[in-house]
Amino acid sequence: MKILVISDIHGNASALSAVAKRERDVDATIFLGDAILSGPQSNAVMGLLSELQPAVSLMGNHDVEVLDPALFAGWPPEWVALNTWIIENLDAAVPEVIGKWKCSHDFEIDGLHFFLHHGDIKNGAESPLPDASDATFEILKQGDHSSTVLFGHTHVQFEKLVNGVNFINPGSVGQSRCGKRVACYGIFQDGIYEPRQVDYEPSDWLSDLEKIQ
């Protein structure tokens, strides 16, 4: 079985489309959150996600902001204006779809047991980056006993073994932080994980960005 793991699309349908085209033969998709804010192709992203039909979708911190715009009211004015424009131009059904997504969640597929978490840790804890303390990753797994934790949020593609638990971040599809213009994601093929990256053409994304008023 081939399982696609994606996270942090952030309104970049050009990047998500490149992933979907490269991995046409996946049997299932796991989405770890942050679909649309703050990118110009939000409706297209939601359409592509619908086509992928994720077996499970998580609600990331920016997805929560779609449902409660007051959460970004204190941001710099430019960001407030951008997010407001995106939300006002969403297809009417999008908030209802996002509202059905899960928070942190146990998930089993093809004999694999995962704990899924978007990756945003509250209460002042450090971000779960590669050099974070083991204690940070213990907070992330919230006492779950799964041997693998899948998470996103930091946009950094990496794996880390902590106290026998494999923590996997597939990286960001739409805003990767690996020093080059690629969409990052992961693949489980018959139970074996592989991080992957694919280049994409950004011209449509840039054109759509220029249309924002």
Please report, for each region that a protein language model flagged, where it lies by residue:
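Acidic, His/Gly-rich catalytic cores of divalent-metal-dependent hydrolytic chemistry
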Residues: 160-213
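Core catalytic region of metal-dependent phosphoesterases/phosphodiesterases
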Residues: 2-99
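Short acidic-hydrophobic surface loop/beta-edge motif
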Residues: 103-111, 160-162
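Active-site environment of divalent metal-dependent phosphoester hydrolases
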Residues: 10-15, 37-40, 63-67, 124, ...
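Active-site-proximal segments of metal-dependent phosphoesterases and phosphodiesterases across multiple
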Residues: 74-81, 111-144, 176
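Anionic-ligand binding region
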Residues: 131-160, 165-168
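Active-site-proximal beta-strand elements of phosphoester/diester hydrolases
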Residues: 2-10, 113-120, 167-171
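Glycine-rich phosphate-binding loop signature in dinucleotide/nucleotide-binding domains
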Residues: 22-26, 52, 109-110, 142-145, ...
